[in-house]
Amino acid sequence: DETQKHFNGKIDFVLHSIGMSPNVRKNRKYYDLDYNFMNKTLDISAVSFHKMLQVAYKQDAIKKNGSILALTYIAAQRTYDSYSDMANAKALLESICRSFGMIYGEKNGVRINTISQSPTKTTAGKGIDGFDLFFDFADKMSPLGNASAEECADYCIMMFSDYTRKVTMQNLFHDGGYSSTGISKKMIEQYQGSK
């Protein structure tokens, strides 16, 4: 109610972009997770999205045909050694998007999508062991290179617009082509050079 008063009405769009794992920060391996930390990871990185959607839904806070986005990562579908329990959190986040996308779409035409972004140099990203090497690897594997934080913001703005009014319940890759690349010429050349 207070948010709607502050914005003089219903909300046009929302971006969920929070994520954190104490297990990742403490470099705990997936086979040795602290379950209290894991619960915190899931709560902050995924369940918070459900909580926000549930409140918005019950308060009827999002305008008809509004747009809701959450940032995710390809580790929800693939294995990345140092991503640990964040991969589970991102998989849950994407599932919440699909489940609530059906409900909110039928009720009010509200679109809910996730954007699977390239590795991005953020505070959270820097906490991942070996992040700089992985950032370089993904950049070399991607035909267009890694998408920057600014480019991700541009993509979000497009997804909030009416140009995407029929796009919902999707996980959209914004990664320079990384998600569809088997191996790039740059990586083959680097591998050959290391022999």
Where are these regions (language model features)?
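C-terminal helical subdomain
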Residues: 47, 114, 132-167, 172-176
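Local beta-strand N-terminus motif with an aromatic residue
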Residues: 10-11, 38
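Conserved amphipathic alpha-helix within the SDR
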Residues: 1-9
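Catalytic loop of short-chain dehydrogenase/reductase
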Residues: 19-106, 116-121, 145, 178
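Short C-terminal tail/terminal secondary-structure segment
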Residues: 168-195
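Conserved hydrophobic beta-strands of the Rossmann-like cofactor-binding core
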Residues: 11-19
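Hydrophobic structural elements of the Rossmann-like NAD(P)H-binding subdomain
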Residues: 15, 69, 112-115, 125, ...
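Short beta-loop-alpha junction of Rossmann-like oxidoreductase domains
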Residues: 24, 118-130, 183
